[in-house]
């Protein structure tokens, strides 16, 4: 158990919050589970998504007409020479500088593992669809080298909302994380508000300029 924290909860009847209404049990994921081996269709999907994310990967930005740099900007140099011959003065901004663009993004993925995800759609269990979607998304974010974390949530009652860390922000996306995803099991109820507030709190501590929370759920309250 990492921590126990309390959060308010919205009452739609009163149109107000109940202070300190829910208790979140924040814990580490179990290390069990076999390494998930994707089938041919899933591998094709992974490759497709990775190609799409590769297009978003930060590239080197070339800045021309700079005061200093490791390479001369020929166009700027010619203009400067022409200006000097014409009026006796010219600009010193005759260099090219390049630097790596930064996306500066942190993403928190929150996954619903309540009992309703044990239902079946088109001959597939919802939780298995969630796992495949989660791995696909995480692979894409890893391709972009974005900082991201993965958490799951379920609840027994308002004093026991379980949020589990599958991957922390400072962890790499590796086979150990894949095993944790493979070990996910459905159970209990969908108390979403406290889990969202806890994930928002974790995300708010990140130094990145842009922060994104993604909720992966079947949308069915249990």
Can you say where each PLM-predicted feature lies in the sequence?
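Flexible, glycine/threonine-enriched loop-and-boundary segments that flank and lead into catalytic domains
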Residues: 77-97, 134, 195-201
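…and closely analogous acidic/polar surface helices at protein-protein or active-site interfaces
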Residues: 117-148, 199
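Von Willebrand factor
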Residues: 159-162, 166-210
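Glycine- and acidic
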Residues: 30-35, 113-124, 178-185
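DG-centered beta-turn motif at the end of beta-strands
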Residues: 111-113, 134, 199, 208-222
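Substrate-binding beta-hairpin/strand module that engages nucleic acids
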Residues: 146-163
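Negatively charged
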Residues: 1-78, 88-106, 121-122
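MIDAS-like acidic motif and immediate structural context at the N-terminus
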Residues: 98-126, 217-218
């Amino acid at each position: 158990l990492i921590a126990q924290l309390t959060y308010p909860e919205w009452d739609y009847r009163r149109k107000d919050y109940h202070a300190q209404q829910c208790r979140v049990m924040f814990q580490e994921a179990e290390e069990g589970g076999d390494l998930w081996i994707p089938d041919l269709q899933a591998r094709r999907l992974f490759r497709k998504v990775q190609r799409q994310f590769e297009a978003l990967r930060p590239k080197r930005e070339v800045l021309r007409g700079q005061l200093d740099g490791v390479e001369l900007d020929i166009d700027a140099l010619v203009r400067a020479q022409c200006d000097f011959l014409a009026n006796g003065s010219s600009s010193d901004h005759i260099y090219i500088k390049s630097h790596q663009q930064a996306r500066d993004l942190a993403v928190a993925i929150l996954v619903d593992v309540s009992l309703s995800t044990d239902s079946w759609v088109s001959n597939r269990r919802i939780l298995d669809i969630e796992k495949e979607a989660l791995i696909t998304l995480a692979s894409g974010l890893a391709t972009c080298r974005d900082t991201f974390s993965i958490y799951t949530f379920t609840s027994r009652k308002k004093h026991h909302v379980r949020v589990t860390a599958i991957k922390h922000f400072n962890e790499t996306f590796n086979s150990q994380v894949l095993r944790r995803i493979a070990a996910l099991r459905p159970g209990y109820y969908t108390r979403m508000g406290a889990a969202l507030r806890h994930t928002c709190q974790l995300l708010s501590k990140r130094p990145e300029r842009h922060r994104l929370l993604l909720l992966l759920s079947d949308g069915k309250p249990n």
